[in-house]
A protein has these predicted regions:
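Conserved beta-strand elements of the Class I
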Residues: 158-160
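Short, positively charged patches
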Residues: 179-180
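Single, function-defining residue in the core of a domain
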Residues: 2-103, 108-111, 116-120, 125-132, ...
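Short Lys/Arg-enriched helix C-cap and helix-to-coil transition segments
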Residues: 136-151
């Protein structure tokens, strides 16, 4: 945060110096220059001393204070953990977990306490940290994002991408959550899978779920992020073909969210659909799902395979119970378009065809690549590929801390870009 503040105030100083020189060189009336400067800072920075770093810091402190007040939801043993007055109360611990740098724990503690004799020990910090549920940091992250993230839209829609990425963890043979056991004689290792929902317009993460690699299920992770979201307004979610499923589309449909999902080309939902034999097309489709195997449904399945689909008992579909006789309709478009290299891509979407014709669908789906770029930055620039904790809760705390860092940087870029755009177009 101090780095952002220094950047902000140094930037303001440079702007003043540049314009002072320009004013003197061109003999511009000082009154006119002062008026422009006042207008610039009022519009670009909202000069009521509520600068960008201050707004971010205020949002973060509010989120931490709000979370710490809900003590029972934050600790592993309610009524016992953090019940006594200590050097490291819950609010201080939450601040430190998010604000500490990459130095050794002892150095970070000395920096935090100002090298005073009352500095808490590393052992005390670890003991206190072990009492905190990872949900506490998750609550802070969600509250911070919802209050500080600028709402940026594409034609009035929030634009999200969902994807997953593997994380190599410090070796820990006792951690069943992430341990991967290879064939006898080969070295074991620890691997987790990060599932994320990424705002493509603000370049910030809005939700994450971490799973052990051996038990990962991207479909469950997606559904949990959809169902628990309280984001208002119109939303478009972009996903790769790994997320194609009846259940995922049904959850998006029930949420009244729009989607663009890349289709599997030779199998999956696209099989048995009646589609044009052309290079590009846009077809409205309705699939009716059932778990019944009565004479009536079997006749429908046989006569209209492009419309009716039978869901097997072991297949997950949350809107028809195993013996429920009802049917469920999925409505979407099947859109095929040309991409680079003479190749073609097919996607499913429930966006309106008049507002979003083939060209717009192609443009939107191409934006999905933003989450891949963000994963690379998160791992290799911010340091997500170099996690230190071994316990599952500690790991998730570190992941959320780095997501917070990435989110702050994303907000800073957006704010700075807007400032400089205004700077060059309005003042120069």
């Amino acid at each position: 945060m101090r780095v952002i503040e220094r950047f902000y105030f140094s930037t303001v100083g440079h702007i003043k110096a540049i314009f002072l020189k320009k004013t003197l060189d061109k003999s511009i009336k000082i009154e006119g220059f002062a008026l422009k400067m006042m207008t610039f800072f009022k519009e670009a920075f909202q000069v009521n001393r509520k600068s960008y770093p201050e707004r971010v810091r205020s949002a973060l402190f509010h989120a931490i204070k709000k979370t710490a007040a809900n003590l029972d939801a934050c600790v592993k043993v309610p009524g016992k953990d953090f019940s006594r007055k200590r050097k490291l109360p819950l609010q201080t611990m939450l601040l430190m977990l998010i604000g500490m740098g990459g130095g050794s724990l002892s150095k970070e503690l000395y920096d935090w306490f100002g090298y005073t004799p009352s500095t808490a020990t590393a052992s005390a910090f670890v003991q206190q940290r072990n009492k905190i549920r990872s949900k506490a940091v998750e609550m802070i992250f969600n509250d911070f994002v919802s209050s500080a993230m600028p709402t940026m839209t594409f034609r009035g829609y929030r634009l999200f991408a969902v994807d997953g990425s593997d994380l190599r963890l410090p070796s820990d043979p006792t951690n069943d959550f992430s341990l991967i056991r290879n064939a006898e004689g080969q070295k074991q290792y620890n691997l987790a899978h990060l599932n994320a929902m990424f705002d493509l317009m603000s370049k910030a993460y809005v939700d994450v779920t971490m799973q052990g690699k051996k038990g990962m299920n991207e479909h469950k992770a997606l559904i949990s992020m959809i169902d628990r979201s309280n984001i208002p307004g119109k939303v478009i979610v972009l996903m790769d073909r790994g997320y194609e499923s009846f259940n995922n589309i049904a959850h998006l449909q029930e949420k009244k969210w729009n989607f663009i999902i890349r289709a599997k080309e030779s199998y999956g939902m696209i099989s048995n659909l009646q589609l044009p034999n052309s290079e590009e097309f846009d077809v409205d489709t309705t699939l009716t799902l059932t778990r019944r195997q009565t004479k009536e449904t079997l006749a429908l399945l046989s006569a209209y395979p492009e419309r009716y689909r039978w869901i097997q008992p072991h297949t997950t579909f949350d809107y028809i119970a195993p013996k429920d006789p009802k049917m469920y309709d999925l409505r979407f478009r099947v859109v095929r378009f040309r991409i680079s290299g003479g190749c073609y891509e097919t996607v499913y979407t429930n966006l309106d065809s008049e507002t979003f014709p083939i060209g717009k669908i192609k443009e939107l789906y191409r934006l999905r690549w933003g989450i891949e770029t963000s994963f690379r930055e998160l791992k290799y620039t911010i340091g997500l590929s170099c996690l230190h904790g071994k316990k599952t809760d500690f790991l998730l705390q570190e992941v959320l801390k780095m997501l917070y860092t990435q989110t702050v940087l994303a907000f800073a870029r957006k704010t700075t870009a807007g400032v400089w755009t205004f700077f060059w177009t309005y003042l120069m």
